[in-house]
Regions:
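N-terminal cofactor/phosphate-binding cores enriched in small/glycine residues
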Residues: 93
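Bacterial signal peptide processing site
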Residues: 24-27
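Electron-transfer interface patches adjacent to heme c in soluble/periplasmic c-type cytochromes
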Residues: 30-90, 100-429, 433-446, 452-585
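Bacterial N-terminal signal peptides that target proteins for export
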Residues: 2-10
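Hydrophobic helical h-region of N-terminal Sec-dependent signal peptides
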Residues: 11-17
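Enrichment for repetitive, rod-forming helical segments
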Residues: 10-11, 548
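C-terminal motif of bacterial Sec signal peptides marking the signal peptidase cleavage site
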Residues: 19-22
Length: 585
């Protein structure tokens, strides 16, 4: 894509309350057309009331782009150019944007089962997925939804183990001759309206009577949609939408010990306040009784040995990194994180360090027993699944080659070749780690300044921690790209507005597992301009900032209830000021 690139140049824990993963619609742009906001051109880089000069650059000198136009999410960070990685960045960008094919051209290898054919399908214009009324998968429709399909602990529960018949991120596409594990067109999404909040709050603001509406998704999948053996039963489904990919390299650069301090700081506050620490910090990550990090907070099974940027060794099973990525906090290093993993498991495009398929035994069995699948393979002697051409031979080969345990490059049935090379993966990671954060806007505006003041006073920053320092950024990489330079962000002050921990909001049909990492707020105010949508929260249920904030006080059990209650009780002028602040950072 063509775009301009620019070279530009602590927090005390209080009551944990998350706030406003959201952007606005017509109600949440408080700036009236006849009262235009003064341009910030003469103020950029200068301290303003309530803002330091550095806050104009949320990604620091090495991670911020001055571009605030519709292409800004696509920009490389200044670190990319300063470190001589521009060409690698542009090559890596192609692997994010291009549609993968089955067996043609440089971008081949999709399937045999997959979620999407390209990364861009889930991250429209590099941003957050868009709210959908159906699960249809089509290029450019912005459907960034993944499903969590699980056996609920109780009727209506958000908790329970993932089912084993389909992959953890369920696949709805397949390459011929196979059938998708789940047929996308049979998945139904219904948006329900909240009539009464569990907290008892009326759905209008008491200061002025302005009303608001809250919606949430109900998702159903009939048994006939599954092509697995066995077919799952007693299931529940929750949606999770992708978040934007910008600035993830900067989050990777936050020192591990600083995140550990954040856990300890919040735990100390809750204990001193006489609160149940294990209710406010996930026991999987924080051992309240021992007052220390729990074993589950660390990721150590990388599947491959690795190396640090300074040349040190990072062995799988030995090197332990704190989890910081995904809503569920399942990943640690970005180089083995959501993007590095997703380029494999979303498309099923193999590479030297990913020699196995993202699949399930139940799907392999169903495909090996499907007469239509066997007939198509039997009619094509060139198929890698053809074996000796007999039904029995094809059945055995299909089953074994589709198993998640089979090494695709070294087995007795067919030896495939890696579909993404180590060099291609390296370029992809230069791109992934090199994406910039757009600079802040309108920090000179009095409403924005008041919005930040209220944001801090109301306790929103307790979870949406404004800033971090990056330290030495001694990143980890898998051995297949060890020694190759990736964008590095040493000693930067960054402003993601996230504490990098999980909290609970107790929403209707909440996220699977109930706990959700605090989503960074930086750059989100540009979403509508960049992507055409501004849906927020984990499943895009919030259509603007106001709805996102009000979901934070849907229940009195919400960790953000008191913060959101302050917003609820505020005047429209103050509510609009907070929204304007969120749109500006």
């Amino acid at each position: 894509m063509k775009k301009k690139h620019y070279l530009v140049w602590s927090f005390a824990a209080a009551l944990t309350m998350m706030l406003m993963n959201s952007c606005s619609d017509e109600n949440s742009n408080p700036q009236e057309p006849d009262n235009p906001m003064e341009s910030d051109a003469n103020y950029v880089g200068k301290a303003q009331d309530g803002f330091t000069a550095e806050e104009w650059y949320p990604g620091g000198e090495l991670g911020t782009t001055e571009n605030v136009n519709s292409s800004c999410y696509e920009d490389e960070a200044p670190a990319v150019n300063e470190q001589g990685l521009h060409d690698n960045f542009k090559t890596g960008e192609m692997f994010f944007e291009r549609q993968y094919t089955i067996d043609n051209g440089a971008f081949k290898g999709v399937g045999p089962a997959y979620l999407r054919k390209s990364c861009l399908d889930c991250h429209p214009s590099y941003g957050h997925g868009m709210r959908q009324d159906s699960y249809a998968i089509a290029y450019g429709n912005g459907n960034g939804y993944l499903m969590a399909i699980y056996t609920p602990d109780a009727p209506g529960s958000n908790d329970g183990n993932y089912i084993g018949e389909v992959t953890g991120m369920p696949q709805t596409g397949a390459a011929d001759p196979f059938k998708a594990p789940i047929e996308a067109d049979k998945i139904k999404i219904h948006w329900e309206h909240v009539n009464t909040m569990e907290s008892g709050l009326a759905m209008k603001f008491p200061a002025d009577g302005e009303t608001f509406d809250l919606i949430y998704p109900e998702v159903t999948i009939p048994s006939e949609a599954f092509h697995t053996n066995p077919v799952p039963s007693n299931i529940a489904v929750r949606l999770e939408s992708t978040i934007g990919v910008i600035g993830t390299g900067l989050l990777d650069a936050i020192p591990q010990e600083e995140i550990e301090k954040q856990y300890a700081s919040e735990a100390a506050y809750f204990k001193s306040a006489g609160m149940d620490v294990s209710e406010y910090l996930n026991p999987k990550f924080w051992d309240a009784a021992g007052e220390k990090m729990a074993a589950g907070a660390y990721y150590s099974t990388w599947g491959t040995d690795g190396q640090f940027a300074d040349g040190g060794e990072g062995k799988t099973g030995v090197y332990k990194a704190i989890k910081r990525f995904t809503y569920a906090l399942t990943r640690a290093s970005l180089q083995d994180g959501p993007g590095a993993n997703a380029i494999w498991n979303i498309t099923n495009v193999s590479r030297p360090d990913r020699p196995k398929l993202y699949s399930t035994k139940a799907w392999a069995k169903a495909m090996s027993e499907d007469p239509e699948v066997i007939a198509k393979i039997k009619a094509n002697p060139q198929s890698p699944y053809y074996a000796d051409g007999t039904d029995a031979g094809i059945k055995e080969t299909v089953y074994n080659l589709l198993l998640p345990s089979t090494n695709q490059f070294d087995n007795q049935w067919h030896k495939f070749q890696p579909e993404m090379t180590a060099n291609n993966f390296y370029d992809f990671m230069v791109w992934h780690r090199g994406l910039a954060i757009p600079r802040a806007r309108n920090l000179n505006d009095k409403d924005v300044q008041r919005g930040k003041k209220l944001f801090m006073e109301w306790g929103c920053a307790s979870c949406h921690r404004p800033s971090w320092k990056t330290g030495d950024d001694n990143y980890w990489t898998p051995n297949m790209i060890a020694g190759k330079l990736l964008p590095r962000y040493k000693n930067q002050t960054i402003y993601p507005y996230s504490d990098m921990l999980q909290h609970k909001l107790y929403m209707k049909n909440d996220i699977h597992g109930s706990w959700c990492r605090t989503t960074p707020l930086w750059g989100r105010g540009l979403s509508r301009m960049c992507t055409g949508a501004e849906d927020r929260l984990h499943d895009c249920r919030a259509r603007n900032e106001v709805e996102a904030i009000m979901w934070h006080c849907y229940s009195k059990n919400s960790h953000a209830y008191q913060s959101a209650l302050n917003f609820y009780k505020a005047s429209k002028t103050d509510r609009d000021a907070v929204v304007k602040f969120l749109q500006s950072i």
